[in-house]
Swiss-Prot record:
It comes from Deinococcus radiodurans (strain ATCC 13939 / DSM 20539 / JCM 16871 / CCUG 27074 / LMG 4051 / NBRC 15346 / NCIMB 9279 / VKM B-1422 / R1). Gene3D superfamilies: Globins, Nucleotide-binding domain of ferredoxin-NADP reductase (FNR) module, Translation factors. The gene is hmp. InterPro entries: Cbr1-like_FAD-bd_dom, FAD-bd_FR_type, Flavoprot_Pyr_Nucl_cyt_Rdtase, FNR_nucleotide-bd, Globin, Globin-like_sf, Globin/Proto, Hmp. This is Flavohemoprotein. Belongs to the globin family. Two-domain flavohemoproteins subfamily.
Length: 403
């Protein structure tokens, strides 16, 4: 257990970590992968190449150090990390490896400043965090495998249908090989896919949001084709109906809360996928919760699920939509295909927002999430009624300790 003296040492190292955090994490990843190349099967190499993962880990380490006296303050973020780890099949034996190379990187970058008492304090702090994460993740693994239809690790699914939803987004309907019932998921959660792209030495793991209401016999994900994206290009271009993909049990903490409050769903681009699962689930359950569905797309050619959302306006009496096109095409009709020309703005959505203390869910790229945060700040929406998912590593203590 960390002593008060060790906690004080960890907190005192925050300025040094702020100054050298990204260098430490880059050094950590390079040395760990050199010694344990098998871990490259867990990590997204694109995030390594761009430095996103190094920045993300540096931010995580800083947040942990700053909250070392009261780690329970990071409870929600720890849960998000645990969900991501479970989706990657991170195991207890991975934690000592990470600890060894993280401490080695701290020692190497800080040099003479890394006194033995500093390294001992950080070893104790990391040990406590590892024990916490291992315990939480064990509970998640046991729950995932123990529920009806559940499983552990990755299992084969067959692509039953492949459907183009827009010029850049394609849906994959997945059924378990051998059949059988599937465990239900919470709308907003995601699947992890493990694929071996031809010509690549390592397995690739990616997460994709489930994009419809839960079904007992299939899952659906909807994937945006990213220019230069190794896995998305492979899924769009090579994977066909009848092919098999390895799938992990659903995970994720960006889920619809069990309340009776009005719901505001705000998305951009492929961020529409978890929102569609949420609103379809409410509609199928006959919920009385008012839903305002706000979506931003470049234009109609990339706007996925337009017809699905339009149907909801007729089938779900408590549903209202506002669609923004910031670069409408010649065939995009204002009032039919989209409701507002231009970018998402507070003035344009204020009149569509429900009365009362609504819950706000928003999903999209990091820049979009920042714009939504500014709108919610103007509306004085408290943190406990904000729920968000950002694709890619977050720049806060929300991504992952390992991957």
């Amino acid at each position: 257990m960390l002593t008060p003296e060790q906690k004080a040492i960890v907190k005192a190292t925050v300025p040094a970590l702020e100054a050298h955090g990204e260098t430490i994490t880059r050094t950590f990843y390079a040395s760990m992968f050199a010694a344990h190349p098998e871990l490259l099967n867990i990590f997204n190499p694109a995030n390594q190449q761009t430095g996103k993962q190094a920045r993300s880990l540096a931010a995580s380490v800083l947040a942990y150090a700053a909250h070392i006296d009261h780690p329970e303050a990071l409870g929600g973020m720890v849960g998000r990390i645990a969900h991501k780890h479970v989706s990657l099949e991170v195991l207890p034996e991975h934690y000592p490896i990470v600890g060894q190379y993280l401490l080695g990187a701290i020692a190497g970058v800080l040099g003479d400043a890394a006194k033995p008492e500093i390294l001992d304090a950080w070893a104790a702090a990391y040990g406590e965090l590892a024990d916490l994460m291992i315990g939480i993740e064990k509970g998640m693994y046991d729950a995932g495998a123990g529920q009806p239809g559940g499983w552990r690790d990755f299992r084969p699914f067959r692509v039953a249908r492949k459907v183009a939803e827009s010029r850049v987004i394609t849906s994959f309907v997945l059924e378990p090989v051998g059949g059988g019932a599937l465990p239900a998921y919470q709308p907003g959660q995601y699947l992890s896919l493990k694929v071996k792209v031809p010509g690549q030495e390592r397995w690739q793991i990616r997460q994709y949001s489930l994009s419809d209401a839960p079904s007992p016999d299939h899952y659906r994900i909807s994937v945006k084709r990213e220019g230069g994206g190794l896995v998305s290009e492979y899924l769009h271009g090579a994977v066909q109906e009848g092919d098999e993909l390895l799938v992990h049990v659903p995970a994720g903490d960006f889920v619809l809360q069990q309340s009776e409050r009005p719901v505001v769903l705000i998305s951009a681009g492929v961020g529409i996928t978890p929102m569609l699962a949420m609103v379809q689930t409410l509609a199928q359950a006959g919920s009385q919760r008012p839903v305002t569905f706000i979506h931003a797309a470049q234009n109609g050619s990339v706007h996925a699920f337009r017809d699905d959302v339009a149907r909801l306006t007729h089938e779900y009496p408590h549903f209202r939509k506002v669609v923004f096109y910031d670069e409408a095409g010649p065939d995009d009709q204002l009032g039919t295909h989209h409701d507002v020309a231009g970018r998402l703005s507070l003035d344009a959505v204020r009149g569509a927002l429900p009365a009362g203390e609504a819950e706000f869910y928003y999903c999209g790229p990091a820049g979009f999430a920042g714009a939504v945060e500014a709108i919610l700040d103007d509306l004085q929406v408290p943190a406990e009624r904000r729920f968000t998912e950002t694709f890619g590593p977050s720049q806060s203590f929300a991504p992952v300790i390992l991957g």
